[in-house]
Each structure stands twice: as C-alpha cells, then as structure tokens.
C-alpha cells in the first residue's frame, strides 16, 4: 500500500499518478472528520477520474489521456457539488479530449425511497452523456460489469 497525494507517482509494475479530483475529501460524516485530498488516477494514459466535479484545472490532463473513465451520475435525482451529471462529464471530456471516454458510476444503485419514478436514472445517464459530447472523442457505453477492449 502506498499513500499518495496529488502529483505523486508510484510504480507498481505500471506508473500510477495521483491527480486531483474535486470532491469532498471527508472520510466520515460530521464535524471534525478527517479530510484528505480527493484523487483520481492516471495509469499509462488511462484516467480514472474518481468522484469529481468539473474544474478548469482539468485542462492539465489534455494530451495525457487516451481513455477516460468518467463518472456520469450518482444515486439520486439531483447531485450536489463534487459530482458530475451527464452534461458536466461531457464538458470535462470536451476539455481534455481523450480518444475514448467510458461513462462510469451509473446504473447500479437506486435507493428504495426513489421508487419507479426515477428508474430512468439506472439507464439514461450514459446515453445523455454520449449525446452531449461535442468533440471527436469516441464514447463507449458499457453496461455495469461489461468489458472495454482498448
């Protein structure tokens, strides 16, 4: 195990660079909770964004990312700061211009209290994301548990 912060790189058979993410860094709820830097990871041109929001500083990733694994939703009908919805995720992808983008963080969890009224949140976010990307990036939508060949 290696503790890392933004900008740190470790070699574990491949080079893993910790890159900033824009999300609440608390590790437990409530006042006095430990707060750490929220992170994403860049591994040989593949960027796992982690839980993040849009930030113009992401432009530093432009030209470094071949494949982006980008969150396009969360778990409910609205998302607060620190999260990307389909339009926000498309904005990030248009900013950094990877060759391929794979929408993640969707389709796996719908709290019981939301019921059938919000079932579209299990299926629509990656399609909305793909429609919102305006650049040349190829969007590959894969169902949860699926595989992407690079």
Segments predicted by a language model, with ranges:
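Flexible loop residues that form catalytic
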Residues: 21, 73, 106
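Metallo-beta-lactamase
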Residues: 43-50, 66-67, 72-73, 80, ...
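A generic short-segment signal for beta-strand/edge and adjacent turn/coil regions
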Residues: 10-11, 41, 70-72, 108-112
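Core dinuclear metal-dependent hydrolase active-site scaffold
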Residues: 3-63, 81, 131, 143-150
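Divalent metal-coordination and catalytic microenvironments
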Residues: 16, 51, 68, 101, ...
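Binuclear metal-ion centers of metallo-dependent hydrolases, dominated by the metallo-beta-lactamase
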Residues: 1-8, 76-78, 86-150
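General N-terminal targeting signals
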Residues: 28, 33, 64-65, 85, ...
């Amino acid at each position: 195990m290696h503790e890392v912060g933004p900008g740190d790189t470790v070699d574990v058979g491949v080079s893993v660079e910790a890159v900033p993410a824009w999300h609440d860094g608390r590790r437990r709820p409530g006042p006095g909770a430990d707060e750490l830097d929220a992170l994403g990871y860049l591994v040989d041109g593949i960027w796992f964004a982690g839980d993040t929001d849009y930030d113009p500083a992401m432009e530093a990733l432009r030209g470094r990312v071949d494949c982006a694994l980008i969150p396009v939703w969360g778990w409910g009908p609205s998302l607060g700061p620190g999260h990307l919805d389909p339009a926000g995720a498309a904005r990030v992808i248009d900013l950094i211009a990877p060759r391929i983008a794979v929408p993640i963080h969707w389709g796996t969890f719908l709290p019981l209290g939301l019921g059938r009224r919000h079932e579209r949140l299990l299926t629509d976010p990656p399609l909305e994301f793909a429609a919102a990307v305006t650049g040349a990036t190829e969007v590959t939508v894969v169902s949860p548990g699926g595989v992407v060949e690079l």
